[in-house]
Amino acid sequence: ITADHYREVLFSSSRTARVGRAFLNSTIISGGSVALVLVTSAMAAYPLARMRFPGRNLIFAALVGSLMVPNVVTLVPQYLLVQQLGWLSTFQGLIVPEAGVALAFGVFLLRQFFLGIPAELEDAARIDGANAWQIFTRIILPLSHPALAALSIFAFRSAWNDFLWPLIAV
């Protein structure tokens, strides 16, 4: 038994066997989507969880409401936007919309996790002279590794399993 057939499928340059290139493209798109989701979700969830500002609950309600809209409903507007930006058949044209699919869930998940972190830790940091960015990056994010890991798994799986958007956008 040899691995010649696997080598042929994964590393062949023929048109019929480009599995290696497809795997690499899927990995780039899924990984880029995860990175974008982690950064944007964390930065959006922190103010929703910890800062007091007018309309905070309305924004969160709209975010939760957007989770109830099926992704298929947004395909045509998404396509038109990506087309106007000139992103069709590009990595950013696949990564940014894929991240948008998981963004609302990511903000919801991280906001709920941030609410569970004791506010006294932030108060102590403020007394020590930390600003909001330092509190976020040096206290909240290090404590959020479990939630960020879970979000990474969900976002990666969502991007990896998406077939319809790449079929339309490429």
Feature map (PLM): residue ranges:
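A structural signal for multi-pass alpha-helical bundles of membrane permease subunits
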Residues: 1-170
